[in-house]
């Protein structure tokens, strides 16, 4: 596995998130961390935003949020900076996120969901390879994918 770490986003590193950049055309697939950090503030009792680090360099961002009404974990705004794409960091980050969720930090659920635009071939393929399957539900132009942790 590619060596990355997840570090909680806090006052020491949130500004670094503003400098993350998507590849050409990817902004239609994922919100920039600025929006996600605003959501993290609003949902702070049920979520954890993470920086994806390669050594001491911020290479990406992802947020885990727990839906107490549906008793499910959601993965929001997964992104890897364009300079780090295609090198396995997204897969490694998702594996770390799933390990974090397996520790049940907010609630006792094994259900994980996320949404993905079907034409985001790289992300969709990654999620499928990690065991996610389409739930049959959608959110606007994105399909919901889900996974049940063992």
Predicted regions and their residues:
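Acetyl-CoA-dependent GNAT
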Residues: 8-77, 81-83, 100-106, 136-139
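Active-site beta-strand termini and strand-to-loop segments that position acidic
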Residues: 53-55, 147-150
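Active-site acidic-Proline motif in GNAT/NAT acetyltransferases
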Residues: 81-87, 118-119
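Conserved active-site alpha-helix within GNAT-family acetyltransferase domains
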Residues: 91, 118-135
């Amino acid at each position: 596995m590619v060596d990355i770490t997840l570090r909680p986003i806090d006052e020491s590193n949130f500004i670094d998130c503003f400098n993350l950049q998507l590849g050409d055309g990817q902004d239609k697939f994922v919100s920039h961390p600025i929006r996600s950090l605003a959501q993290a503030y609003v949902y702070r009792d049920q979520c954890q935003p993470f920086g994806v680090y390669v050594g001491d360099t911020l290479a990406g961002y992802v947020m885990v949020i727990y839906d107490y009404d549906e008793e499910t974990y959601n993965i929001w705004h997964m992104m890897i900076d364009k300079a780090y794409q295609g090198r396995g960091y997204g897969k490694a980050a998702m594996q770390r996120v799933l390990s974090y969720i397996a520790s049940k930090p907010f609630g006792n659920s094994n259900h994980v969901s996320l949404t993905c635009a079907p034409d985001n071939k790289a992300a969709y393929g990654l999620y499928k390879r990690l065991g996610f399957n389409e739930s049959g539900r959608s959110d606007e132009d994105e399909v919901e994918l889900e996974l049940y942790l063992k």
